[in-house]
Every structure is written in structure tokens, then in C-alpha cells.
Amino acid sequence: MAKKKSKDKAGSNTIAMNKQARHEYFIEDEIEAGVELQGWEVKSLRSGKVNIAESYVYVRDGEIFISGMNITPLQAASTHVVANPTRVRKLLMSRKEIDNLIGRVNREGMTLVATTMYWVRSWAKIKVGVAKGKKLHDKRTDSKEKDWNRDKARIMKSSLR
């Protein structure tokens, strides 16, 4: 009798992360979306050749798209397919989720940011964050808080010795 495969941790299926988004924006909510991909793009994702740091998500004609996501084509890709690494890709969500995002972006002055790309079984998914931009003083406050937490941990560690 064959053993069942143990379920992987969510972090182990991560393809790419946008760490810059947490620095530049207050992310209030995250929603999972599928991505419309071509065959060569899936192969490149499996080898980890993707960058979502410079990507942005926008709404057009009641649909949500991601632009600026760079998927580098493999050398062994098919010769009869023209690979465009930065093409605009459609994000796949339910109509209810799309309407909710459109309403929040238009009404509350929020923006949409791609935060993480990961695998769910054999499908590539993107977490889209509903975010508000940080001002310079917000970034300074975050930096001070991060430094204080680091110093606090250092003090606690030395006091336990």
C-alpha cells in the first residue's frame, strides 16, 4: 500500500515574493487570484524564473490584470512560440471578488499590489493586496520600530546569559 504524501507547508510552495510592497504600502487585505499563463510560462515558473517586484495590478473593463511581471523564458522553449516576458496577464477571480476590489479601489483611494506568487497543487496563484501608499514619515516610523525590536531582542538575549 502506497503512503500518502504529506501536505507541504504553505511557504514551501512559494515561487516569488514582493518584499518591496510591504515597505512601500500598508497592506490591509489580501485576496488569492489565479493567473492566465501560457505553457512556456508555467515551465519557467517551475524553474523559478519570475520577478513580481516591478509588477502592478490594475482594473480595466471590469477585469483585473497584472502588468510588469517578468517571466524569463527558458532556453529550451519552443521555437514556434514568440515569448514576451513582460506581457499583460489576466488575473482569474470570481465576479464577486472583482466587484469588491473595484469598489474598494475607487471609493477608498486604495491600490492593488501583487505580494506573493505560489503553487496550489498544479496551479500558479498570486496574492493581490489591497494597499494604501506609505508616506516618508510612515517609513521612518517603521524603521525605528524595527530597530527597537531588534535592540529589545538583543537585550533580552544578553540578560538571559
Swiss-Prot record:
The keyword RNA-binding applies. It is found in: Cytoplasm. It holds the Pfam family SmpB. This is SsrA-binding protein. It comes from the Bacteria. GO terms for cellular component: cytosol. SUPFAM superfamilies: Small protein B (SmpB). PANTHER family: SSRA-BINDING PROTEIN (PTHR30308:SF2), TMRNA-BINDING COMPONENT OF TRANS-TRANSLATION TAGGING COMPLEX (PTHR30308). Residues 137-161 are annotated as: Disordered. GO terms for biological process: trans-translation. Belongs to the SmpB family. Gene3D superfamilies: 2.40.280.10. It comes from Aliivibrio salmonicida (strain LFI1238) (Vibrio salmonicida (strain LFI1238)). Keywords: Cytoplasm, RNA-binding. One of its GO terms (molecular function) is RNA binding. PROSITE patterns: SSRP. Required for rescue of stalled ribosomes mediated by trans-translation. Binds to transfer-messenger RNA (tmRNA), required for stable association of tmRNA with ribosomes. tmRNA and SmpB together mimic tRNA shape, replacing the anticodon stem-loop with SmpB. tmRNA is encoded by the ssrA gene; the 2 termini fold to resemble tRNA(Ala) and it encodes a 'tag peptide', a short internal open reading frame. During trans-translation Ala-aminoacylated tmRNA acts like a tRNA, entering the A-site of stalled ribosomes, displacing the stalled mRNA. Residues 139-154 have a biased composition (Basic and acidic residues).
